[in-house]
Amino acid sequence: MSLFDGKKVIIIGDRDGIPGPAMAECLKGINVEVVYSATECFVUTAAGAMDLENQNWVKNFTDQYGAENIIVLVGAAEAESAGLAAETVTAGDPTFAGPLAGVQLGLRVFHAVEPEFKGAVDSAIYDEQIGMMEMVLDVDSIIEEMKSIRADYCKFND
């Protein structure tokens, strides 16, 4: 059974990293429901913070389905941007500007290049949709940053 099995997935893609549709395509054929997908420009938003509208969607879907049923997938091109997004959906908006300011959801959050995601989806589809980006992204730094945020703030240790 996959970590993603039966979960509601919120996808926050990055124009310069992994776009939302690529992650959504990878999730086809496994037992998940993509409830929201967006592709943003992380560099374009204030200090790389998560878009305020996306924060609102994350908050609303978490209220609707329960934090235990939500997984957030990010596709940020840089470890720092991925970490800010992960921190926002776990510990609250670090910029204190959006709907998640001071809201500690503790959600499960993964980057598309992490082994937890890669191992849960069809490898051929992953290679077709995301594999090329692994060559240009600093995968090790992204994984390290995401693990650190989850260790500090995620409420679910599965």
Swiss-Prot record:
EC assignment: 1.21.4.2, 1.21.4.3, 1.21.4.4
TM region positions: none
GO cellular component, one term: glycine reductase complex
Record field: catalytic activity: acetyl phosphate + [thioredoxin]-disulfide + NH4(+) + H2O = [thioredoxin]-dithiol + glycine + phosphate + H(+); acetyl phosphate + methylamine + [thioredoxin]-disulfide + H2O = sarcosine + [thioredoxin]-dithiol + phosphate + H(+); acetyl phosphate + trimethylamine + [thioredoxin]-disulfide + H2O = glycine betaine + [thioredoxin]-dithiol + phosphate + H(+)
Active site: 44
NCBIfam families, A to Z: reduct_selen_A (NF040748)
Family membership: Belongs to the GrdA family.
Identification of the protein by name: Glycine/sarcosine/betaine reductase complex component A
